[in-house]
Amino acid sequence: MRIVFQGDSITDAGRDRRNYFDMGNGYPKYVSEMLKKEFPNAELELINLGISGNRTCQLFDRLYPDAIALEPDVISILIGINDIWHRHDVDRIETTNEQIAVNYRAILTRLRNRTQAKIVMLAPYILD
């Protein structure tokens, strides 16, 4: 089973980007450790493709070269923190709530149309 983690710095979590099997120190690492412990005989391929600083529009742009092309069984996405957080930076372009919703729908639509993967969409905790 191939599981791909996509997102921003919360997913990236300091991973070594030269090695996409490096889980970093965030939730992908803990999920990976739990899965390996719970299913020790399962053939798991766990890939972290989080990129620190990414926004929803950037994740959308890299869905094919990153996640879809890998033909994962499961895609876990946690994105949106930077869309919200950077509203407070004077020199950043603001992403409205409406645009974030449009981007989320576009991400889900592209994944549903281009892959058979199960999608696990995690809400940015700042939105909960």
Predicted regions: what is each one?
Residues 30-45, 58-128:
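Alpha-helical cap/lid subdomain in secreted, periplasmic
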Residues 1-52, 64-71:
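Serine-esterase "nucleophile elbow" of acetyl-processing enzymes
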